[in-house]
Amino acid sequence: MVKVMLGIISVTLIWGYTWVAMKVGIHDIPPLLFSGLRLFIGAVPLFLILFIQRKKLSIQKEHLKSYIIMSLLMGLGYMGILTYGMQFVDSGKTSVLVYTMPIFVTVISHFSLNEKMNVYKTMGLVCGLFGLLFIFGKEMLNIDQSALFGELCVLVAALSWGIANVFSKLQFKHIDIIHMNAWHLMMGAVMLLVFSFIFEAVPSAEWTYQAVWSLLFNGLLSTGFTFVVWFWVLNQIQASKASMALMFVPVLALFFGWLQLHEQITINIILGALLICCGIFMNTFTFSRRKV
């Protein structure tokens, strides 16, 4: 259990700062290109680890479909859509919206993992929805279409991440974690780079020091290292319990965004973040009844 706690803490700290690093990176590099390179950089050291450990690199034929689905969910569905939407949303707010993921996980797990909904989880879902209303409210009232579009993209990415978490627990429980992550990152990278080549003006990328640093941080730490740790944690404890720890990530992201990027933290964002964190807690904490 100590290893699980250390894994959760390391993931939380790294992912808390990831949003600032991403915002810095996509300022100079188109979002799909940034995402594709990030996944590629994250995948390379994982393949090296497999090679050093003399583990089989190829994918078994019967598992190929699962790897492709995982790549679509985490590559295009999560990383691609998230980074594209982040162009229009502050880093801290992006994190708050992405970490509605545990609420999606709880709902999906009810139907696929037999982790049943109860009154507390239902209350948590309601809290999360009200939190989203607080965050979306300003853009909906002011008809800020670009910000609203970006926020909806981030929510779609959160849903895709939630589906991927449950899918990994169903399909990859007995498959080597490093092997699974190496391949779904590499396959996702190829997909994103193809989309970038088709839809983005790649020559517009500016390879500044900040952009290169952001890519390395996001690729090696935020992707390669943390994805392995996170999916390992998911195999050790309930998916919903693991997701509860992630409520601290948006709090750190809001702080880092305010500290480094001078992003504004409004009362709506604070209330929305609190309600979403409350929703995550209600969805994932195990409430026990005392016998009288």
UniProtKB/Swiss-Prot annotation:
Residues 13-137, 159-285 form the EamA domain. Belongs to the EamA transporter family. This is Uncharacterized transporter YoaV. It is a multi-pass membrane protein. The gene is yoaV. SUPFAM superfamilies: Multidrug resistance efflux transporter EmrE. Disulfide bonds: none annotated. The chain crosses the membrane at residues 6-26, 32-52, 68-88, 94-114, 123-143, 147-167, 182-202, 214-234, 242-262, 265-285. It comes from the Bacteria. It is found in: Cell membrane. Keywords: Cell membrane, Membrane, Repeat, Transmembrane, Transmembrane helix, Transport. GO terms for cellular component: plasma membrane. It comes from Bacillus subtilis (strain 168). Signal peptide: none annotated. The lineage of its organism: Bacteria, Bacillati, Bacillota, Bacilli, Bacillales. The keyword Repeat applies. InterPro entries: AA-Vitamin_Transporters (IPR050638), EamA_dom (IPR000620).
